């Protein structure tokens, strides 16, 4: 699995677990609506750590909790 695919997968998992929608989590984390739209539409890759950090802040989890999945150990380049 590629890194960006793993991150998107985890974002969806967290939102489902927490009963959040993606936009709300990112807005709570301080991302602009236009950046969220570009991310959702695939115009922007979300593999920057700051993007993941903002999502985590909005979702109420830590970066450690976000990346604590086995599939992050088998990332393709």
Predicted regions and their residues:
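Short, charged recognition helix plus adjacent turn
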Residues: 1, 13, 38, 67-77
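The alpha-helix within a helix-turn-helix
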Residues: 15, 26, 56
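A short, Lys/Arg-rich alpha-helix, primarily the initiator
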Residues: 1-21
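Phosphate-coordinating loops and pocket residues in cytosolic domains that bind phosphorylated ligands
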Residues: 27, 41, 68
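Short, basic-rich loop-to-helix N-cap that marks the start of a DNA-contacting helix
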Residues: 43-57
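Intrinsically disordered, low-complexity basic tails/linkers immediately adjacent to helix-turn-helix/homeobox/MYB/SANT
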Residues: 57-70
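Residues within the helices of the helix-turn-helix
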Residues: 12, 23, 53, 64
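Short alpha-helical DNA-recognition segment
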Residues: 20-38
């Amino acid at each position: 699995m590629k890194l960006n695919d793993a991150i998107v997968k985890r974002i969806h998992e967290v939102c489902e677990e927490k009963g959040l929608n993606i936009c709300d989590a990112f807005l709570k984390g301080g991302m602009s609506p236009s950046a969220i739209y570009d991310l959702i539409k695939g115009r922007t890759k979300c593999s920057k750590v700051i993007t993941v950090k903002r999502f985590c802040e909005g979702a109420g989890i830590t970066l450690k909790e976000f990346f604590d999945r086995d599939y992050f150990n088998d990332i393709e380049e």
